[in-house]
Amino acid sequence: MKKIYLDNAATTPIRQEVSDEMVNVMQSEYGNPSSTHSVGRSAKAVVETARKLIAKQLNCNAQEIIFTSSATEATNWILRNAVSHFGVKRIITSKIEHH
């Protein structure tokens, strides 16, 4: 019987070719992309290539693509920037915005 998964808020099934590429990159480019040594620079190059590919698909600049470590970090980042850079005075939200 085929599974139907409807809880994609925090997780989602991964296509096999995506999983294969992720494993390949994690095994070969394991450096910290924030480091200045050669392994870190190599990892950073992979991240920047991904950023450019995503930007091309979204028809935007690579500088507009921001990677965060979680939905919580992303939500906090956008809310803080809405207040500090765009003068947003009031934010209305609910408990269901991030479960």
Please give the residue ranges for each predicted region.
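Pyridoxal 5′-phosphate
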Residues: 1-99
